[in-house]
UniProtKB/Swiss-Prot annotation:
Protein name: Putative 3-methyladenine DNA glycosylase
Similarity-based family: Belongs to the DNA glycosylase MPG family.
Major enzyme class: hydrolase
Superkingdom: Bacteria
Cited InterPro entries: Formyl_transferase-like_C_sf, MPG, MPG_sf
E.C. number(s) listed in UniProt: 3.2.2.-
Gene Ontology terms: biological process: base-excision repair
GO molecular function: alkylbase DNA N-glycosylase activity; DNA binding
Family annotation (PANTHER family): DNA-3-METHYLADENINE GLYCOSYLASE
SUPFAM superfamilies for this protein: FMT C-terminal domain-like
Keywords from the named record: DNA damage, DNA repair, Hydrolase
């Protein structure tokens, strides 16, 4: 489904301290939309966020649905905290905390900096597939549990907002509960998505 509006991402410069808190201390849908176009780097490797999903504490598809646990503790951190978890026992996934227990999953990114390192880590030189999914993105950026549970203004992370971009929205991917919620968001027309929007 195509969204007729753009997101509200504005400003320039890296988000730190109070600006980081203000950006993320909002509902997960708003944050997920406004993350589109933002520039994310991990140890200098990264690019433009092109696809996100929103999750809430009362959302059966969310890790926080049954409350805090040892595994999801980072999801209850401060706004702008990083929550990393593993799926299928293999792939890492990157999330940013909004309100406690709610988060934005980063699903895809358009590579911009450190591309040779991404290609080496991913074992491919196909630009559009380097970060076209949450697991691929984490592999390309060298993300694992060792850099979980820290704010985005702390090394090795850096994130900067962008001008508004046109967005599309649709159902989230790979879930069976609350699967109809249209809480997946992407940059309209981007070639750097995990899957096309329909």
């Amino acid at each position: 489904m195509t969204d007729a509006t753009t997101n509200g991402a504005i400003g320039a410069g890296t988000l730190t301290g109070e600006s980081l808190r203000k950006f993320f201390e909002r509902d997960a849908i708003t944050v997920s939309r406004d993350l589109l176009g933002c520039h994310l780097t991990v140890d200098g490797v990264g690019g433009r966020i092109t696809e996100t999903e929103a999750y809430f504490p009362d959302d059966e598809a969310s890790h926080s649905f049954r409350g805090p646990t040892k595994r999801n503790g980072a999801m209850y951190g401060k706004p702008g905290n990083v929550y990393i978890y593993r799926i299928y026992g293999v792939y890492w996934c990157l999330n940013f905390v909004c309100h406690p227990g709610s988060a934005a999953l980063i699903r895809a990114l358009e590579p911009e900096t450190g591309i040779p390192r991404m290609m080496e880590r991913r074992g491919t030189d196909m630009l559009t597939s380097l970060c076209s999914g949450p697991g691929k993105l984490c592999q390309a950026l060298g993300i694992d549990i060792a850099i979980n549970d820290r704010l985005l203004d702390r090394a090795p992370y850096a994130i900067a907002p962008s001008a508004p971009v046109p967005i599309v929205s649709g159902k989230r991917i790979g879930i069976t509960k609350n699967a109809e919620a249209p809480w997946r968001f992407g940059i309209q027309g981007s070639r750097f998505l995990s899957k096309p929007f329909r």
